[in-house]
Amino acid sequence: METCVLLLGLFLTSVHVTTAGSAAHRCFCQVTGTLDDCACDVETIDKFNNKDIFPKLQKLLSSDYFRFYKVNLNNGCPFWTDHSQCGLKYCAVKPCSPDEVPEGLKSSSYKYSEKASHDTEECEKAEKLGAVNGSLSDETRQALEEWKKYDDESDRFCMLDDEDSPESQYVDLLLNPERFTGYKGAEAWRIWNSIYEENCFKPYSVNRPLNPLASNSGDDGQGFYRWLEGLCVEKRAFFRLISGLHASINIHLSARYLLDENWFEMKWGHNVSEFQQRFDEDLTKGEGPKRLRNLYFLYLIELRALAKILPYFERSTFQLYTGQDTQDDQNKKLLLELLHVAKSFPLHFDETALFAGNNKEAMKLKEDFKLTFKNISRIMDCVECFKCRLWGKLQTQGLGTALKILFSERQIEAMPNKQHQSIISAQSAGNCVFVQRFRKNLHKCQRVEELQIVVVETQTVTVKMFQERATVQTDMHKHMTFPMFGYIQ
């Protein structure tokens, strides 16, 4: 859930993008009305995001609980052999020193407040009293642990880092913002091409519009969209989520662009031409508005996940624990306010419309959906730019967490405390950041003048909230895994 909040926060609040000029107006004038496969319209989302969600999310993500993210940036690429690394200085990530991270986040001895520990002990006593037979052999206990581990992994939508690995380090997201790094060209295209061509249910015979790695077939994209509309709603939704995630990344790159550099300072700001190149209807042969509409679709998914997870966070045993009691209490209060606001949205995405019908076919489709998104999360370890890899892992983890919340076989409300903790581990933070960034993307002053990245911030919050930082967690399994790099036209 932390991940959800982090990501939602990052999507929602990270950057203001001033897009003056006729081309920018054209970009947004085309993004109106009802979204495909949804009962919601763009205007309702804009109003709700800018007025109700954005201010709370922005404040929440600046807190210590959400700004520190533990990640392993040294995993090898599982799909191809490539030992090259980005040599650009803006690709570097500065990890935190041990004394910069609050003790409550990094030390297991600080994970539980006195109240939460007492509540957890009472729950454990009740469980023991109700147990039929508490004596298990070592072999049986090991088998049960392996079974539970397999069960947890089979329920995930993304791959997660091992937080206990010596390679995992805390990163301050505020000091390592997502922005343009100079990472582009063939290597960045290779990442996105692998995602779109091999992990979006698309046959190679169907050409994706504006793909720089494909030969020019003269297709104006109509063939691709005929194929897309012929898909089942679940696979169509999958493509739109990936496209929306890609759009959010490119909005960030355009919003935080290195405009000038000298011996004394670096000037970061909005690069209007970069934004237009990616989203203007004329410059993208009609693709730009579609990308922006997919960003709104992604926002609805993240928002619905935050609303659905509310019952868990209302439990008295749940704490956002950093060791700073007053601040922790304030953060939990603010988080609950945010989740209640999310729940109040009048036109939520109806997740029950997906994976419906024949149960056997629906289960097979969901498993394909899950495995394909897991693959995409693994591709993040192939990104050579470490700054891009950081934000890629965070955002895929945030979206993966949102999907788990919406489509897991286990109902959130029915989970006992310990199982709940496993959902709330690393994934929670990512989702929150993801939502935050997405919301920033959508937070536009006067609708056209300023574009803010909102989806990523929500993802960050979701990831963080599901991270191993929840106070009540006595037997928590590690979960972590989200994209940000050069755009494939």
UniProtKB/Swiss-Prot annotation:
<feature type="binding site">
    <location>
        <position position="291"/>
    </location>
    <ligand>
        <name>FAD</name>
    </ligand>
</feature>
<feature type="glycosylation site" description="N-linked (GlcNAc...) asparagine">
    <location>
        <position position="375"/>
    </location>
</feature>
<keyword id="KW-0472">Membrane</keyword>
<keyword id="KW-0325">Glycoprotein</keyword>
<keyword id="KW-0732">Signal</keyword>
<comment type="function">
    <text>Oxidoreductase involved in disulfide bond formation in the endoplasmic reticulum. Efficiently reoxidizes P4HB/PDI, the enzyme catalyzing protein disulfide formation, in order to allow P4HB to sustain additional rounds of disulfide formation. Following P4HB reoxidation, passes its electrons to molecular oxygen via FAD, leading to the production of reactive oxygen species (ROS) in the cell. Required for the folding of immunoglobulins.</text>
</comment>
<dbReference type="GO" id="GO:0071949">
    <property type="term" value="F:FAD binding"/>
</dbReference>
<feature type="binding site">
    <location>
        <position position="181"/>
    </location>
    <ligand>
        <name>FAD</name>
    </ligand>
</feature>
<dbReference type="GO" id="GO:0034975">
    <property type="term" value="P:protein folding in endoplasmic reticulum"/>
</dbReference>
<keyword id="KW-1015">Disulfide bond</keyword>
<dbReference type="GO" id="GO:0015035">
    <property type="term" value="F:protein-disulfide reductase activity"/>
</dbReference>
<feature type="glycosylation site" description="N-linked (GlcNAc...) asparagine">
    <location>
        <position position="271"/>
    </location>
</feature>
<feature type="disulfide bond" description="Redox-active; alternate">
    <location>
        <begin position="86"/>
        <end position="91"/>
    </location>
</feature>
<keyword id="KW-0274">FAD</keyword>
<feature type="disulfide bond">
    <location>
        <begin position="77"/>
        <end position="382"/>
    </location>
</feature>
<feature type="disulfide bond">
    <location>
        <begin position="29"/>
        <end position="38"/>
    </location>
</feature>
<feature type="disulfide bond">
    <location>
        <begin position="200"/>
        <end position="232"/>
    </location>
</feature>
<dbReference type="GO" id="GO:0016972">
    <property type="term" value="F:thiol oxidase activity"/>
</dbReference>
<feature type="binding site">
    <location>
        <position position="243"/>
    </location>
    <ligand>
        <name>FAD</name>
    </ligand>
</feature>
<keyword id="KW-0813">Transport</keyword>
<dbReference type="InterPro" id="IPR037192">
    <property type="entry name" value="ERO1-like_sf"/>
</dbReference>
<protein>
    <recommendedName>
        <fullName>ERO1-like protein alpha</fullName>
        <ecNumber>1.8.4.-</ecNumber>
    </recommendedName>
</protein>
<feature type="binding site">
    <location>
        <position position="246"/>
    </location>
    <ligand>
        <name>FAD</name>
    </ligand>
</feature>
<dbReference type="Pfam" id="PF04137">
    <property type="entry name" value="ERO1"/>
</dbReference>
<keyword id="KW-0249">Electron transport</keyword>
<feature type="signal peptide">
    <location>
        <begin position="1"/>
        <end position="20"/>
    </location>
</feature>
<feature type="binding site">
    <location>
        <position position="179"/>
    </location>
    <ligand>
        <name>FAD</name>
    </ligand>
</feature>
<feature type="disulfide bond" description="Redox-active">
    <location>
        <begin position="385"/>
        <end position="388"/>
    </location>
</feature>
<keyword id="KW-0256">Endoplasmic reticulum</keyword>
<comment type="similarity">
    <text>Belongs to the EROs family.</text>
</comment>
<keyword id="KW-0285">Flavoprotein</keyword>
<feature type="binding site">
    <location>
        <position position="192"/>
    </location>
    <ligand>
        <name>FAD</name>
    </ligand>
</feature>
<keyword id="KW-0560">Oxidoreductase</keyword>
<feature type="binding site">
    <location>
        <position position="278"/>
    </location>
    <ligand>
        <name>FAD</name>
    </ligand>
</feature>
<feature type="disulfide bond">
    <location>
        <begin position="27"/>
        <end position="40"/>
    </location>
</feature>
<feature type="disulfide bond" description="Alternate">
    <location>
        <begin position="86"/>
        <end position="123"/>
    </location>
</feature>
<keyword id="KW-0676">Redox-active center</keyword>
<dbReference type="GO" id="GO:0005789">
    <property type="term" value="C:endoplasmic reticulum membrane"/>
</dbReference>
<dbReference type="InterPro" id="IPR007266">
    <property type="entry name" value="Ero1"/>
</dbReference>
<comment type="subunit">
    <text>Predominantly monomer. May function both as a monomer and a homodimer.</text>
</comment>
<feature type="disulfide bond" description="Alternate">
    <location>
        <begin position="91"/>
        <end position="96"/>
    </location>
</feature>
